[in-house]
Each structure stands twice: as C-alpha cells, then as structure tokens.
C-alpha cells in the first residue's frame, strides 16, 4: 500500500510538471499573439507633376571632349544619357554612328553648320563607339572620326527625358506649352498621358502626300506638326514624346516594324507599372496601345484598335 501511494504521488507530481509545462507554453503563445509589431503600409510611388512644364536642357559643358580637325564629341554628360557631336570639316553630307557592343548601330545625319546636335545613349550602360563619316559619293563614306566611350548612366531615364535630334524641343516650344495646357488640372501620369493622346488623335490627320514624298534624313519639327495639325507617323510620335517628356514622363520614340511596314510609335514609363510598351490609354478595363498614328488614321475602328492592341504586331528596332 505504501509503495502504491509513492507511485501515485510520483505520477501526480509528474502530471503537475507536465500540466505546468502546458500552462507555460500556452501562456507563451498567448503572449506572442498579444505582442505588438509595427508594420508600415507600403508606399505607393507618386508622380510629381511639374508646375507648367519641365524641360531638361542638354549642354556641351566641355568637361570631357574628344576632337580632331573634322569633328568634336562632347561626352561630358554621358551619365545623364546623352552625347553631343558637331562637324567641323568642309564636306556637305555627314553621318554619325552610335553603337553599343552587342546592340544595334544607330545612324544619324549630322548638320554641316558646325553646331552641336544631341544623341541619346538609348542602349544603357556599356562600351560605345561614336563615329563620324564624310560622304564621298552616293552611299560611299569615309571615316573622319572615331572614339570609344565607357558609359555609366546614373539616371536611367535620362535618354528618354532630354531632347535629342529626333525629339527636338525646348522650353519655348509651342509643343511644350500645349502639353502644359493639356495637362493643367491633371494630377497623375495616366491623366497626363490620356489628355495628350486624346488631343493628338482627335486633332491630327495623317499626311498621305508627305508620306509618299518624304526623303531619307527627315527630322520632325514638332512645332510645325502642331501648327499644321497633320503629319506622318514619325511626326505623331515625336510630338507626343516631346509633350510627355516636358511633363516629366520618361518616353521612348520607338522605330521598328508593324508587319512589313517601317513605323514609329511610343512607349512610356509609369510609376507602379514600369515601361508600358505601345500603350497609352486605360479605359477602365483594358490598356490600349500607344501608337497614335493608327488610332487616328483608323478613326479608332474596332479592327484597327484590335490590331494596335496586339503587341505581337510591333517589332521594335531603335529607341530614341
């Protein structure tokens, strides 16, 4: 009997220890459940819309310059995504090539007046070659200048915010003023993009005669396009790009193919979305591609909007 009492007492003690352990564990769980941890809400990136407009101005600051008797390259602002080149020789027809290792070679016409022109470093960081060529005859050229550059762009949007040879504007441009007018009262990027898009497709008409007669080397004059309210695809895209860039929205003027046609369109960077290729308008349900030429000349028919809405119809080659 005495032995039985001792065993019973031992079991009760063990039960007490186990029960106490359970009570301790449960108390710990309750304490953990009731403890407070501060978790901040995720911040939504906000668009800082400029008052009126904001135009970045390229400058040939002379800090980093390469030159010979034929050409001068100012590479002082490669970190901002652009270079400036001028020709100082005597030949009338000049070409510039800007190429990054492993990427497309960008070929431009260069004026022969001895003034700088701006060229974007569209392909991002890496090793570039900048070459200037003088025309001999026909399509034959001789190299007049060559320089390699190691580029490290600190502002990845720089190439698509600054004006350049293809998208040429300044603070006094009528296109910039119109962009500010269209964007007044709008607070977000989508609103700005939509306002500019709607204006262009509703007020510009496709210039068929110009499309049939345009020559190689043609560069859009965005203020002329705005005043005449007509143009080719290149004009549409350049005008919208200028307006959007002046509203601090990174915008690419893209040249490539739609089917077998050589064509131009634009892409924008939207905070919270990233680069939106060929898209400008959200109707509450679907994004619409950003190509303003087809939307305008097609009068926004169901068929043309379906074509524009299929990104597979677009093959980008160059971005300016």
Region annotations inferred by a language model:
Residues 211-212, 219, 230, 251-260:
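Catalytic cysteine-centered active-site loop
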Residues 235-313, 317-320:
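Hydrophobic/aromatic-rich core segments of domains that either
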């Amino acid at each position: 009997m005495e032995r039985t009492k001792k065993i019973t007492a031992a079991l009760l003690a063990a039960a007490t220890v186990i029960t106490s352990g359970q009570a301790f564990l449960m108390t710990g769980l309750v304490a953990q459940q009731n403890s407070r941890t501060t978790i901040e809400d995720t911040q939504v990136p906000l668009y800082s819309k400029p008052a009126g407009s904001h135009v970045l101005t390229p400058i040939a600051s002379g800090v980093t310059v390469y030159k010979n008797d034929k050409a001068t390259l100012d590479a002082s602002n490669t970190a901002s995504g652009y270079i400036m080149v001028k020709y100082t020789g005597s030949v009338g027809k000049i070409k510039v090539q800007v190429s990054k290792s492993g990427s497309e070679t960008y070929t431009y016409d260069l004026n022969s007046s001895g003034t700088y022109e701006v060229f974007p470093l569209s392909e991002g960081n890496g090793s570039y070659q900048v070459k200037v060529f003088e025309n001999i005859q026909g399509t034959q050229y001789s190299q007049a200048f060559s320089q390699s550059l190691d580029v490290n762009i600190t502002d990845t949007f720089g190439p698509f915010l600054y004006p350049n040879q293809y998208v040429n504007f300044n603070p006094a441009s009528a296109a910039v003023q119109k962009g500010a007018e269209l964007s007044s009262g709008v607070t977000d990027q989508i609103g700005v993009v939509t306002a500019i898009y709607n204006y262009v497709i509703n007020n510009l008409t496709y210039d068929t005669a110009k499309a049939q007669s345009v020559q190689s080397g043609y560069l859009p004059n965005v203020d002329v396009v705005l005043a005449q309210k007509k143009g080719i695809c290149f004009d549409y895209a350049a005008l919208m790009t200028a307006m959007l860039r002046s509203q601090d929205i990174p915008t690419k003027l893209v040249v490539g193919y739609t089917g077998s046609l050589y064509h131009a369109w634009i892409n924008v960077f939207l905070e919270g979305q990233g680069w939106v290729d060929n898209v400008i308008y959200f109707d509450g349900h679907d994004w619409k591609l950003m190509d303003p030429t087809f939307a305008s000349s097609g009068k926004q028919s169901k068929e043309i909007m379906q074509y524009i809405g299929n990104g597979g119809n677009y093959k980008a080659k160059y971005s300016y």
